[in-house]
């Protein structure tokens, strides 16, 4: 199965291009400005600024505890910054924004988040129900809903598990179901926390090939990983966050394993 304009998951190139209009100065899709976040009195994210443009594939690397997962939760709206600001497609994402039910629903349709631990987001009785849940909330015609679910399950090779319980699957199968469930909503950006963790080589190849095709179709990907070889394989722009919460951009091979990235 291939992803193309108007094919497979109905890639919406107008949506992928943003909402600012042709010829206008296009804001970054994701922008963090001096963001601070603390948990239980401990500063987890300390003055982080970064941006992700439309059509980019960006990888966050860094040691455990540097704040990668928290940054992704902030970007998905699961956490709110204590200080600084977060802009999505030029709009400030804060408590007031997320209390607007229409804006929040559209935001969560456009930002697809896959947890590192797939158990955190699987909750339906069967794989088919899991993959259908998100797009079923979007008011799609029945035939379009069925097509999205079928295509997403085939894409991540879980179609034969349609009636299986997600809770009885292997870790790698759960990861692929979680990816299918998010991708079936056709988000503008995929935010993926360690997307290849727990996957065997064949499953990893499925994910890598999908991500390359998704970006080629005009979509955006932000992922965290510890693996430099994966970043090189994807040709991703690398953003490193060190143990002191400093943000550094550098070619992957020049940033040593002592900073927390591994081969």
Where are these regions (language model features)?
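Conserved ABC ATPase signature
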Residues: 165-169, 173
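The feature captures the beta-strand-to-loop junction immediately N-terminal to the Walker
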Residues: 61-63
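H-loop/switch region of ABC-family ATPase nucleotide-binding domains
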Residues: 225-226
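Catalytic Walker B motif of ABC-type/P-loop ATPase nucleotide-binding domains
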Residues: 190-193
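Conserved ABC transporter NBD signature motif
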Residues: 84-96, 107
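Helix-to-loop junction immediately C-terminal to a conserved catalytic motif
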Residues: 76
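Conserved ABC ATPase "signature" region
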Residues: 143-161
């Amino acid at each position: 199965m291939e992803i193309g304009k108007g094919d497979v998951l109905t890639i919406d190139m107008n949506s992928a291009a943003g909402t600012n209009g042709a010829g206008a100065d296009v804001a970054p899709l994701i922008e963090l400005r001096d963001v601070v976040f603390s948990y239980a009195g401990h500063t987890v994210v300390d003055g982080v600024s970064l941006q992700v443009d439309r059509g980019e594939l960006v990888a966050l690397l860094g040691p455990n505890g540097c704040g990668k997962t928290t940054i992704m939760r902030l970007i998905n709206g699961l956490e709110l910054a204590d200080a600084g600001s977060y802009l999505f497609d030029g709009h400030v994402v804060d408590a007031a924004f997320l209390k607007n039910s229409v804006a929040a629903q559209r935001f969560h349709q456009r930002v697809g988040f896959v947890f590192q631990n797939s158990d955190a987001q699987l909750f339906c009785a069967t794989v088919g129900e899991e993959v259908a849940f998100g797009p079923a909330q979007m008011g799609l015609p029945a035939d379009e809903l069925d097509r999205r679910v079928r295509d997403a399950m085939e894409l991540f090779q879980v179609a034969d598990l349609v009636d299986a319980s997600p809770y009885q699957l292997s870790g790698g199968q759960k990861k692929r179901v979680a990816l299918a469930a998010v991708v079936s909503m056709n988000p503008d950006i995929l935010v993926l926390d360690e997307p290849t963790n727990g996957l065997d080589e064949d499953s990893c190849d499925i994910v890598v090939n999908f991500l390359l095709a998704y970006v080629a179709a005009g979509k955006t990907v932000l992922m965290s990983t510890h693996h430099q070889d994966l970043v090189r394989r994807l040709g991703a722009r690398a953003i490193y966050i060190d143990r002191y919460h400093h943000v550094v951009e550098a070619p992957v091979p020049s940033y040593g394993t002592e900073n927390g990235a591994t081969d």
